[in-house]
Amino acid sequence: MKNILSWMLMFAVALPILGCDNNGGSQTSAMGKDMVEDSVLTDNQKLSRTFGHLLARQLSSTEDFTLDLTEVIKGMQSEIEGKSAPLTDSEYETQMALVQKASFEKKCSENLASAEKFLKENKDKEGVIELEPNKLQYRIVKEGTGRVLTGKPNALLHYTGSFINGKVFDTSEKNKDPILLPLTKVISGFSQGMQGMREGEVRVLYIHPDLAYGTSGQLPPNSLLIFEVKLIEANDDNVSVAE
């Protein structure tokens, strides 16, 4: 949805310059004219047509809802010609808000169902330990041999966060160096899931949205989050010596 609104803003900026080319020639339109071979397009025509490609790609790839690209083009043409839009600005904003709200609620419901289904199936897999029923699970990938993390200290670690589909949304690996995190400042599922880790251990956390960002934040609403975490070092004041 945010992508759509951003591109709508770009429409408003671009419309005044779409009516003619830089040489003052006649308006170039995709409607009612034969396609011009790319090899004979002017620089302005190439720029204009590429803008159209980018716009169509952006609008057709959104996961929220699909706009009718034909009507979008007609709307642009009508605006250039000085014709009225079918909705007033106020009506448009109201209708867009309703569409956005419905899309958000649908995504919340779908993601929550996917998260709960995943956790229900995942808990029976080999090596998976459930810390909180249907909310928080972990699996040890590599055993650690160092001190045990207890309480809620700072922790020097590497992490990679991904969604159920495997898409990575954040990682400390991009900076190569491990990151020092205050575990009192992160989502509760992350800090709870790390308790008991030994230095050197690699653990995968499976976190229900209730223990993550829920319906707020920059990530898709009600996303189940999966973190692979390697504990490098725990704060000396909050560790116990491994037996």
Swiss-Prot record:
Q: What biological process terms from GO does the record include? A: protein folding
Q: What class of enzyme is it?
A: isomerase
One MF term in the entry's GO annotations: peptidyl-prolyl cis-trans isomerase activity
- Compartment list: Cell outer membrane
Question: What keywords is this UniProt entry annotated with?
Answer: Cell outer membrane, Isomerase, Membrane, Rotamase, Signal
Q: What Gene3D superfamilies does this protein map onto?
A: 3.10.50.40, Peptidyl-prolyl cis-trans isomerase, FKBP-type, N-terminal domain
Question: Which GO cellular component terms are attached?
Answer: cell outer membrane
A Pfam family matched in the record: FKBP_N
What EC designation does it have?
5.2.1.8
UniProt domain PPIase FKBP-type: residue ranges: 152-235
Cleavable signal peptide: 1-14
Q: Which reaction does it catalyse?
A: [protein]-peptidylproline (omega=180) = [protein]-peptidylproline (omega=0)
Question: Domain of life here?
Answer: Bacteria
Q: How does it sit in the membrane?
A: Peripheral membrane protein
Recorded family membership: Belongs to the FKBP-type PPIase family.
Describe the task this protein carries out: PPIases accelerate the folding of proteins.
Q: What is this protein called?
A: Peptidyl-prolyl cis-trans isomerase Mip
